Each structure stands twice: as C-alpha cells, then as structure tokens.
C-alpha cells in the first residue's frame, strides 16, 4: 500500500475539500470536530479506500491527528 507520507497528503487533500474549516495540522483534531465532522471523515475515508469504518473507530485516539487517521486507514487495508 501507499507510503505513509503520500497517503497523509492524499487524505489531507480529501478532508480539506469536505471540511475546509478544520485545521488538519492540529494534534487536537478530535476536539475541533462535531459529530457531523467525525461522520464526514469516516465516510470520506471509507469511500476513498474501500474500507469499513464505523462508530467504534471514532475514538479520540484515532481522530487525534492526521497521522492517527492515516494509521487507522492503513490498519484497515
């Protein structure tokens, strides 16, 4: 699968398109998101990578930062 850095930039671009007001460089990403933002992220990543993400994946740890989102996607591939 894709190199971590390449995947991180791909995911950043995708998520900035659907959630332009969110700072994806933050290490406190989860605190910036409401439930709609969390759902949008999970659906966007599920569709883009053909993986299954659900409410059990929507943890503060998984949504802490862009790096943790990339790790989550890679763990499902």
Where are each of the predicted segments found?
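Phosphopantetheine-attachment site and its flanking helix in carrier
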Residues: 31-48
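Phosphopantetheine carrier-protein modules
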Residues: 14-33, 50-59
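AMP-binding/adenylate-forming catalytic domain of the ANL superfamily
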Residues: 57-68
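Thiotemplate assembly-line natural product biosynthesis machinery
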Residues: 3-24, 72-77
């Amino acid at each position: 699968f894709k190199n971590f850095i390449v995947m991180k930039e791909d995911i950043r671009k995708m998520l900035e398109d659907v959630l332009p007001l969110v700072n994806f460089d933050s290490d406190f990403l989860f605190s910036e998101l409401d439930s709609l933002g969390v759902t949008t992220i999970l659906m966007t990543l599920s569709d883009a990578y053909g993986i299954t993400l659900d409410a059990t994946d929507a943890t503060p740890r998984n949504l802490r930062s862009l790096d943790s989102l990339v790790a989550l996607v890679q763990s499902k591939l």
